[in-house]
Amino acid sequence: MSTDNKQSLPAITLAAIGVVYGDIGTSPLYTLRECLSGQFGFGVERDAVFGFLSLIFWLLIFVVSIKYLTFVMRADNAGEGGILTLMSLAGRNTSARTTSMLVIMGLIGGSFFYGEVVITPAISVMSAIEGLEIVAPQLDTWIVPLSIIVLTLLFMIQKHGTAMVGKLFAPIMLTWFLILAGLGLRSIIANPEVLHALNPMWAVHFFLEYKTVSFIALGAVVLSITGVEALYADMGHFGKFPIRLAWFTVVLPSLTLNYFGQGALLLKNPEAIKNPFFLLAPDWALIPLLIIAALATVIASQAVISGVFSLTRQAVRLGYLSPMRIIHTSEMESGQIYIPFVNWMLYVAVVIVIVSFEHSSNLAAAYGIAVTGTMVLTSILSTTVARQNWHWNKYFVALILIAFLCVDIPLFTANLDKLLSGGWLPLSLGTVMFIVMTTWKSERFRLLRRMHEHGNSLEAMIASLEKSPPVRVPGTAVYMSRAINVIPFALMHNLKHNKVLHERVILLTLRTEDAPYVHNVRRVQIEQLSPTFWRVVASYGWRETPNVEEVFHRCGLEGLSCRMMETSFFMSHESLILGKRPWYLRLRGKLYLLLQRNALRAPDQFEIPPNRVIELGTQVEI
C-alpha cells in the first residue's frame, strides 16, 4: 500500500491502527495483573508497582520504538517485512555456511510464530470475557464456553474473507485506544504520584531491591510487548511511515496512560489487582467496556490468523511447506487469503488450549518464550543485514547487536522459568513446525536430485528428436518442469510408452523469486529451443499465486499463442518408496511421505483444468 498520496496518509495510518496494533493493544487487559498477582513472592507494593511500570514503559521505548520501528523496519524486501524476509535478506551476501545458519535461524523464528499464534487468540479473548467476573461474578463459569463460542464464529467467517468487517477494525481499535487513554488519564489525575515511574531509575531500583526474583519477574513484563513482530510483518500492507506515525501519536501514549492509570489505581486500592483493567472504569461503563474489549480482542485474533495465513503462503512459495489450497477472499487485495487446513488446525489447537488452561492467568505462564526467542533471532538477522547489505561499520553494528541482546537475552532467559508451567506448549508446537519445514525442504531437494542425477542433456535430446522425430500429433503439449535445463520426467515417459510427440512442445517452469512481487514485464521469459520446442519460464514473487492461464496470456502477448482448452498438460506423478536409511532419517522420510500424500496436486496449485491434464507415474526411491 502506498503512502505517496498525502491525502491517504490519515486513512492508511488509521488502517494500521486497526490491524498492526491489535495484539500489543490488548496487552493491558492482563499484563500488570500478572506482574503483581503475587506469583513472584511480593504483592502490590509501592516499589513493585513503580518498578514494573518503569520496566514496561522503557521496554516499549527500547524494544518497540527504537529496535523495531527505527532499526529493524529499515530491512525490507521491496517494502515487505517478516522473519522469513529478514532471513532472505541476511543470506544474500554471505558464505554458503553462514547462509545455512541464517536460514536455520529464520525457520526457527517462523516456527516460534506458529507456537505463539495458538496462544494469542485464546489469552486475548479470555481476558476480555473475564470482565464478566467484575460485571456479574455468578457468570464466571461461562467464561470458557463464551470464549469458545466467540472464537468459533471468528474461525467460521474466515472463508468469507474480512473485506467487509475489516472496514470496522480501524474505527473500533481507534475507539479502543482512546478508551485506554481516557481510563488511564482519569486514574492518573486522581493519583499523579505514579508518573514518577517514568524515571528509569525505578527499574534499576526494582532489580536492586528484589534481586533474583526481579529477574524472573521479567517473564511477566514481556507480556506488554507481545505482538511486536506484527509491526515488521505487516510493513508491506501499510508502509513504514504510517505504522510509525500510528505508534507515536496514538498507540504508545494510550498504552502508557493505561498502564500508569492501572498503577495509580493499585497504589490507591491494592485489592483491585484481581482485574485492574476493568476496575479502572466506573460501574456504569463496565458492560460497554466488556463489549468493546471483546471486539478488540477478536480484531487482535484476526490479525494473528491473517498473519499465520501470510506466513504459511510465504513458506509454501519458498519451498519450506508442502503445497496446500490457498483461497483468495478478495479480488481487490491479494493479501487477503484463506487456507482451510491451517484455519481448522489452528481452531482445534486454540479450543484445546482454552479448555486445558481455563483462565488467562494460566495461559500467561505459557506466553513469552517464543516471542522473546524470535526477538533474539531478529536482532541477529537484522544486524547481519546492516553489516552485509548496508555495509555499516562492523564496530557500530557490534554495539547495536550487544545493546539489543542485553535486553533480549535476559527476557528470553527469564521466560525459561515458565517452561514447566506452560511454556512447553509454544516450544513444542514450534519444534514440530521446524521439523516439518526442514523435512519438506531437505527431502524435496533429495528427491529432485535423485530424479535428475541420471538425466541427459535437454539440448541433446531436443536435437535428437528434431533429427529423428517420432510420430507427431496435432496440437500443443505443455510439460511442467521443475528445473530449466532438465528433461521433464513426463516427457521421457511419454516418449518411452506412447512414442508420440505433439506438433508444438512447451517446457514450462514456474519459479519463485526472492521478492514479494514480480513485475508483469518480467513475468514470462520465452526461448525457442528448436522449430517445435519452446522453453517458458514464468517468475512469481512469494506473495503471488502462480496461474497458468495468466502465463498463457503473457505468452500470447509475446507471440506464442496458447489456448488453455486446446492444450494438453503432461505432468509426472512420483510414487515414492523409502530406501535403506539410518532410523532417524527413516523417520524423517516417513514424515515426508505423509506430507507428500497430503500435498495439493500440481493441477490444483496452478489452476489447470483437470480434463486437460495427463499424469504419468514413476516410482522413485528416496
Curated annotation (Swiss-Prot):
**How is this protein situated with respect to the membrane?**
Multi-pass membrane protein
Cytoplasmic side, ranges: 1-8, 70-102, 158-164, 234-246, 297-336, 384-395, 440-622
Question: What biological processes does GO assign it?
Answer: cellular response to cesium ion; potassium ion transmembrane transport; potassium ion transport
Q: GO cellular component terms? A: membrane; plasma membrane
- Which catalysed reactions does the entry list for this protein? K(+)(in) + H(+)(in) = K(+)(out) + H(+)(out)
Instruction: Recite the UniProt keywords alphabetically.
Output: Cell inner membrane, Cell membrane, Ion transport, Membrane, Potassium, Potassium transport, Symport, Transmembrane, Transmembrane helix, Transport
Single annotated GO MF: potassium ion transmembrane transporter activity
Q: What is the protein name stated in its UniProt record?
A: Low affinity potassium transport system protein Kup
| TM helices/strands, residue ranges | 9-29, 49-69, 103-123, 137-157, 165-185, 213-233, 247-267, 276-296, 337-357, 363-383, 396-416, 419-439
Where is it localised? Answer: Cell inner membrane
Cited HAMAP family: Kup
What organism is recorded for this protein? Answer: Escherichia coli (strain K12)
Functional summary from the UniProt entry: Responsible for the low-affinity transport of potassium into the cell. Likely operates as a K(+):H(+) symporter. Kup is probably the major potassium uptake system upon hyper-osmotic stress at a low pH. Can also transport Cs(+) and Rb(+). In the absence of potassium, Kup-mediated Cs(+) uptake partially supports cell growth, however, at a much lower rate than with sufficient K(+). This effect depends on the maintenance of basal levels of intracellular K(+) by other K(+) uptake transporters.
The record places the following residue ranges in the Periplasmic compartment, namely 30-48, 124-136, 186-212, 268-275, 358-362, 417-418
Q: Its family?
A: Belongs to the HAK/KUP transporter (TC 2.A.72) family.
Q: Gene name?
A: kup
How does a null allele present?
Deletion of the C-terminal 130 amino acid residues decreases both the affinity and the Vmax of the K(+)-uptake process by 1 order of magnitude.
* Disulphide-bridged cysteine pairs: none
Which N-terminal residues, if any, form the signal peptide? none
On the tree of life, the source organism's domain of life is: Bacteria
Activity regulation behaviour:
Uptake is inhibited by protonophores such as carbonyl cyanide m-chlorophenylhydrazone (CCCP), but not by valinomycin.
Q: Name one Pfam family in it.
A: K_trans
User: What InterPro entries does the annotation carry?
Assistant: K+_transporter, K_trans_C, K_trans_N, Kup
